[in-house]
Swiss-Prot record:
Name of the protein: Tegument protein UL47
Coiled coil (residue ranges): none
Function: Tegument protein that can bind to various RNA transcripts. Plays a role in the attenuation of selective viral and cellular mRNA degradation by modulating the activity of host shutoff RNase UL41/VHS. Also plays a role in the primary envelopment of virions in the perinuclear space, probably by interacting with two nuclear egress proteins UL31 and UL34.
Motif (Nuclear localization signal): 63-75
Domain of life: Viruses
Subunit-level organization: Interacts with US3 kinase. Interacts with UL31 and UL34; these interactions seem important for efficient virion nuclear egress. Interacts with UL41/VHS.
Post-translational modification: Phosphorylated by US3. This phosphorylation is required for proper nuclear localization.
Organism: Human herpesvirus 1 (strain F) (HHV-1)
Amino acid sequence: MSAREPAGRRRRASTRPRASPVADEPAGDGVGFMGYLRAVFRGDDDSELEALEEMAGDEPPVRRRREGPRARRRRASEAPPTSHRRASRQRPGPDAARSQSVRGRLDDDDEVPRGPPQARQGGYLGPVDARAILGRVGGSRVAPSPLFLEELQYEEDDYPEDVGPEDGGGARSPPKVEVLEGRVPGPELRAAFPLDRLAPQVAVWDESVRSALALGHPAGFYPCPDSAFGLSRVGVMHFASPDNPAVFFRQTLQQGEALAWYITGDGILDLTDRRTKTSPAQAMSFLADAVVRLAINGWVCGTRLHAEARGSDLDDRAAELRRQFASLTALRPVGAAAVPLLSAGGLVSPQSGPDAAVFRSSLGSLLYWPGVRALLDRDCRVAARYAGRMTYLATGALLARFNPDAVRCVLTREAAFLGRVLDVLAVMAEQTVHWLSVVVGARLHPHVHHPAFADVAREELFRALPLGSPAVVGAEHEALGDTAARRLLANSGLNAVLGAAVYALHTALATVTLKYARACGDAHRRRDDAAATRRILAAGLVLQRLLGFADTVVACVTLAAFDGGFTAPEVGTYTPLRYACVLRATQPLYARTTPAKFWADVRAAAEHVDLRPASSAPRAPVSGTADPAFLLKDLEPFPPAPVSGGSVLGPGVRVVDIMSQFRKLLMGDEGAAALRAHVSGRRATGLGGPPRP
């Protein structure tokens, strides 16, 4: 205390945010944050990297909602001391954080590092022994959704012998995995991926009917349809929040669900089942090829992340950033000698052709095709259906609350929860990419004995942990398990729906990975190659939908933070880079949708169904509400307790404080141009104009 200060007066706690280990730095040629990205993302196709290199010299100011001096003083006085904030969500200051950013790149842009760094030794969990993890878990951390278990209980058994040609989804073309043609002999490829044995397990019409049912869902929270439906009212779409933010206006929710279906399931079904008459078997061939390409990319990206620092351009700060992120990432590839088919080259591009472009489109909606789901066995079919249903419902709920023409209607509690959801989705997607890379390597190299291959076939590991990973449960608990998260869930209808969607993806991925381990067999059970292949493809379907849902969340985060001026959205320090790595690896499976394109698609869908956004509330008699309280009951077992107390997400950082990183990594050129035009007062291309009267 200063000698001039009167006795008894305490100095006000500083609200200046703390520093973060990673932050923005103006980029140059191989310098700073972009230098690190070059080391990870370099490859034959540099189009995405070139988009990342676009940087404005000066950051545009964030357009914030106006507030008077009294409101500013009140907000400053209510800010908690930094020491009382949750350690994993601390906010870094731009200046302090910038001093810790790094520069550097690897010497050879074409060579994949093939040294034996320690990160590539060990099993599925890297240097951590899976048996040691099982000893620490003590019990199962896999808690499937009660709604999923109820749906699974009423699902009838498979009846492949009774499915006729007219019920099996149409003609079947010869299956193939294009990326492996000429590299793997036909008999070996058919043994690894017996696509010719993937006959429909149920009739397509039966699966179509079941997708339209949703046990336990009350009126207003509709299940996935199989075609566009006319339950929503046309005309004005009201975005004002109800007096009780724990509920939705039923009319607006129905309109949001209609928009969600037009940009996801209806889009993919229109392009495949109706226009081109593509068969589900063709979709499965694409999926198998995409998963193999994804496995190659996952191996390459993981190898570069763990590459030893070498070359004069890599300084101590660059090596430190690489070490920090490498210690957190789930991408821990096995040695090149164990997987020669994955490590033979660099990153691979997506499959060419119009069919592949369609399968990768529509926000990852291939699992909304009943004919594709009918090719899966019972548990995986229900898991894919349930994940599709809940992410569809969450997309509809987001579109009922977020719109470029009604940003001021978004509540702070809704914006704050979005970053937590994105954190979990990024970790879950990263772990799934790693799992697919390992299991594909195991399928293609059946005579190689590697600890990672043994781990992914270890049933007890996947029975104890979702995706067999302590990082997944750690991220879930860190983002969604603290007191603040539970309060956000209980006090917002949108947050409850988003939490249920994350839980559904957790349940689906935990189910298919456990079923894969069972299909691998052991000394007491026969190995089932066809069942194992079905489970790999089911994981690919769920991952594709997860990525589409994550892009939807990113679009809403950018809208709230950059267009609405909200400071509430926070993400883990490494979430943008983690998700960007995932998007790079999954290009063969999923064509990402930038925020600008997402909102352009939403606007086109709204015009198609004649919806006009307004910042008002509906009047009687259409002002009824829908309460998602049933989802809060479903969420009671989630998230499970973590295995350890360490942080998976890293320190929390406000999205507005890492604007250039977020923009370069996740928004793309079009989104950056839209933001630049918007903050300068011009209409933001891709973000929509003023609402129509």
